[in-house]
């Protein structure tokens, strides 16, 4: 009996620990970039959907931006189309663009919306074409001082914040696929990390969170010690020193850009940890790395 009572008291203490964070975030908007292993592993996917739904029920307004690289790769492989990347960006010809749009908008987006709705949320799936949400233009990557044409790869020109605010501040959970639209109606494939940061900037989100397949930032990659909090200046220094590289660079640069444009806090989370979103937001210690100015 006493053992059972201790467990109940422990649960109550967890709720009490979360109370000040719930009060602080009530009515605020949190942008979550959902990607990595948490999109592939069914158990992790289920926990993420539970976290996002719970946020909405306690008065926080989550906006989800998702990737879909592995699924795009899978479809392209079946079509015998070889994927090419330049500085981590997918070279996107017309066929690849059609596949990316089909997978991101027609499959991945709708699966996430369905899962959130099954959890009791009211999710709405949209992409940058809807309501001119993401106005984009063609992106050229600079390689060795030369401009490289990546095809239908875009960069964000502007975000129609009104669309997202209207949904998020009501009872809905917007789920955004990173497809943008040009002035002439051309669709563009845009890096999902960049889209998440641009959305967070446009709506002045309270938090921007990137789910990744790493524990967090480290001064030494061989160390088990995670940096719990770090300044933007320190992050830039780590990039210069080669301690941050690859796919982590657009994430941390997105964090810094968002902070400079009014986002209060940014986070790099290990999406492989069950309920990582709740653990970061509603516990004293948190997990992962918080980046601040």
Curated annotation (Swiss-Prot):
Catalyzed reactions per annotation: N-acetyl-L-glutamate + ATP = N-acetyl-L-glutamyl 5-phosphate + ADP
Identify which top EC class this enzyme belongs to.
transferase
SUPFAM superfamilies, sorted: Carbamate kinase-like
What would be an example GO MF term here? Answer: acetylglutamate kinase activity
What are its GO cellular component terms?
A: cytoplasm
What subcellular compartments does it reside in? Cytoplasm
Site positions per UniProt: Transition state stabilizer: 33, 251
Q: Which InterPro entries match?
A: AceGlu_kinase-like_sf, AcgluKinase_fam, ArgB, Asp/Glu/Uridylate_kinase, Glu/AcGlu_kinase, NAGK-C
Q: What is its EC number?
A: 2.7.2.8
What domain of life is recorded for the organism? Bacteria
This protein's pathway: Amino-acid biosynthesis; L-arginine biosynthesis; N(2)-acetyl-L-ornithine from L-glutamate: step 2/4
**Can you supply a Gene Ontology BP term from the record?**
arginine biosynthetic process via ornithine
PANTHER family given for it?
A: N-ACETYLGLUTAMATE SYNTHASE, N-ACETYLGLUTAMATE SYNTHASE, MITOCHONDRIAL
Task: Say what the protein does.
Answer: Catalyzes the ATP-dependent phosphorylation of N-acetyl-L-glutamate.
Question: What is the protein's name according to its record?
Answer: Acetylglutamate kinase
List the source organism.
Answer: Caldicellulosiruptor saccharolyticus (strain ATCC 43494 / DSM 8903 / Tp8T 6331)
Cite the source lineage: Bacteria, Bacillati, Bacillota, Bacillota incertae sedis, Caldicellulosiruptorales
Q: Which gene encodes it?
A: argB
